[in-house]
């Protein structure tokens, strides 16, 4: 079957692909909070448990409800190989730098921040980004300060106005059985006594394992956007 637009591809092939994964690897799937997605574009900030499925499942929820899918920020380490890059592009993914010199990393962070603000305010589309650099491996979901600092790099406005423009909307996803639990445990164990160095192709193996592994019950929640009043309280 051929698809003429990105929307057609996401609402056709990708919708069926994710639905098939859920049927084969999940015993139950529920979601809530779509009423919190208004006509205003959102910066979806999600906890991060699986490399591919966290964003893909939310996009699936949007597709089955005939809602426009969002652009997705992914680590530059995942953009390897022509096939992966092509799939990423057709699913509206863009890369966030994961390595490089301090100068290059800062420059790339500014560009990513400017692009995300452009997508939300000018292109009038939403963005999905993980709350941290890499998946949570110890079960402690916390938004990294570096992610919030990156958001701020694209505006000279004061804190409240800067972040209010992004319409930050937290996303929570949970899996009964942690994706890649064995691989994450091994990484945590090794990291406890030495620097962990990934093997070539390890990210791809984790993507495949996360997709194929049994997940039990899955739930995803879209929470209300952070309000101006809440931002003023934090200022």
What are these regions (language model features)?
Residues 37-40, 89-96, 125-132, 219-221:
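Glycine-rich, often proline-containing surface loops adjacent to acidic residues and nearby aromatics
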Residues 35, 46-50, 76-78, 97-100, ...:
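Short, flexible loop/turn elements at secondary-structure junctions
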Residues 41-113:
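Long, hydrophobic, well-ordered secondary-structure blocks that form the structural core
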Residues 40-42, 68-71, 125-127, 167-169:
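Generic beta-strand structural signal
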Residues 1-42, 48-59, 63, 85, ...:
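Membrane-anchoring hydrophobic helices of lipid-metabolizing enzymes
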Residues 105-235:
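Non-catalytic C-terminal accessory region of glycerolipid acyltransferases
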Residues 29, 42, 70, 93-94, ...:
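A broad, low-specificity signal marking well-ordered, structured residues that form hydrophobic/aromatic
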